[in-house]
Amino acid sequence: ASGAKGDHGGAGASTXXLLT
C-alpha cells in the first residue's frame, strides 16, 4: 500500500482516489 502516493491500498485510495 502506497498510502501517500495514492497508487493502491487503504490510505492511498482516499488520497488518490483510486479504490484498488
Curated annotation (Swiss-Prot):
Protein name: Cytochrome c oxidase subunit 6A2, mitochondrial
Keyword Mitochondrion: yes
Tissue: Heart specific isoform.
Molecular function (Gene Ontology), one example: oxidoreductase activity
Keyword Oxidoreductase tagged: yes
A single BP term in Gene Ontology: oxidative phosphorylation
UniProt membrane topology term: Single-pass membrane protein
Keywords: Membrane, Mitochondrion, Mitochondrion inner membrane, Oxidoreductase, Transmembrane, Transmembrane helix
Region ranges (Disordered): 1-20
Family to which this protein belongs: Belongs to the cytochrome c oxidase subunit 6A family.
Its job: Component of the cytochrome c oxidase, the last enzyme in the mitochondrial electron transport chain which drives oxidative phosphorylation. The respiratory chain contains 3 multisubunit complexes succinate dehydrogenase (complex II, CII), ubiquinol-cytochrome c oxidoreductase (cytochrome b-c1 complex, complex III, CIII) and cytochrome c oxidase (complex IV, CIV), that cooperate to transfer electrons derived from NADH and succinate to molecular oxygen, creating an electrochemical gradient over the inner membrane that drives transmembrane transport and the ATP synthase.
GO (cellular component) term, any one: mitochondrial inner membrane
Subunit structure: Component of the cytochrome c oxidase (complex IV, CIV), a multisubunit enzyme composed of 14 subunits. The complex is composed of a catalytic core of 3 subunits MT-CO1, MT-CO2 and MT-CO3, encoded in the mitochondrial DNA, and 11 supernumerary subunits COX4I, COX5A, COX5B, COX6A, COX6B, COX6C, COX7A, COX7B, COX7C, COX8 and NDUFA4, which are encoded in the nuclear genome.
Pathway assigned to this chain's UniProt record: Energy metabolism; oxidative phosphorylation
Species of the source: Canis lupus familiaris (Dog)
Localisation per UniProt entry: Mitochondrion inner membrane
